[in-house]
Amino acid sequence: MFAKKTTLIIPTRNRPYFLLKLLKNLKNFKIKFKEIIIIDSSNKEIKIKINNIIKNFNCKIYHSKPSTSLQRNIGLKNKDKRSKYVMFLDDDIIFKKNSFLNLNNKIVFHEKNKSKILGYGFNQNKKTKKNLLENIKKSKISKVFGLYSKKDGIVMSSGWQTKILNIRDDTLTEWIPTGAVVFPSKVLNIKFDENFGKYSYLEDLDFSLNLRKKNYMNKFLIVANAVFFHPNDIERINFNFGLIEILNRFLIVRKYKLNIFYFFYMSFIKCLMTLFMSLRNIKNITKFFGNIIGILLCLKKLIFY
């Protein structure tokens, strides 16, 4: 099993219940790692609870300022250098039975055949709803201009990426979510970009693009029957998130020299969708203003920097 040769890195913040549930989930499936590293950025009173939880599990713990990117970097810095693999997990993941075995079989197969795979992702299963943005993404104009794609895990020139959810067959992708992923240690010659802020929105997209840039291998593999669930997937509808979802994507577009015009087109559509959503939930209006300010700040950076 690959896990015995793997350093597991879990960033967490103020969620002792979910962390405990995850660790119990792994223990129940008898998944044993070479080492487990917890990087905790919780408030003082919650840190005590986290420390009490990990006493019952064989974990190392480090403390950090709140930032998913920073926390993962601390994990990378302190991992056992002999680990053949590194696995990143969000603290609220729940795995389906045999998911690790199924992923292990794919790793063994592709390494035996010397496939050029950068990383192996578990398959998130989630109920989804169609919305205005999804319909626009699939429109003819979006397809004609290459703004979006019906394929899973594609990074478009607009800076938007297609989702990776409910995959039916093993799928090669251009980016990979870092919520439940395994990388061979030999390809991890980069760090997570800490400029993505406290929440680190889109850090996984940036990390994927950077990995592809620095390595000769340029694809990731999502394993269809290696299933996990993300029960605490919260919809974020505040001003700050509306702001960073525009600014962080702009950072990626500039960093990897993607299409600025297509980025602004999709940002404008995203803004309209947020406004439309506020008709059903007035709380979305703060996110809408965040989108607007984000677009204006991007224009300012484009003109003056």
Predicted regions located by residue number:
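Short, well-formed alpha-helical segments that are part of the catalytic scaffolds
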Residues: 15-28
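A short, conserved alpha-helix in the catalytic core of glycosyltransferases
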Residues: 174-182, 187-190, 195-225
